[in-house]
Design a protein with these regions (language model features):
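Long, charge-dense, low-complexity tracts
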Residues: 1-81
Length: 81
């Protein structure tokens, strides 16, 4: 869960009227500094879902790299026995 929050913190919204983190967008809308009608929610949702999918793929790549590294360390250690 904490790792998912890290990915969510990295997501940036890019719109004509706003560019920045999602939580800042929500803050500005709540303070009525941005008009909710200028925000294409469907576009943000679609882009966020793509971002999450890319993050999951990256996470698997990192996990795969770790497994290879750990296996290599085990081979080296077993040769030293």
């Amino acid at each position: 869960m904490a790792q998912e929050q890290l990915f969510a913190d990295e997501y940036k919204v890019n719109l004509d009227v706003f560019e920045g983190p999602l939580d800042l967008l929500l803050y500005l809308i709540r303070r009525e500094e941005l008009d909710i009608y200028d925000i294409p929610i469907e576009r943000i949702t679609t882009e966020y879902m793509k971002f999450i999918e890319d993050a999951r793929r990256l996470n698997l790549d990192i996990a795969g790299e770790f497994i290879v590294m750990a296996a290599t360390l085990m081979v080296i250690k077993s040769r030293m026995l």
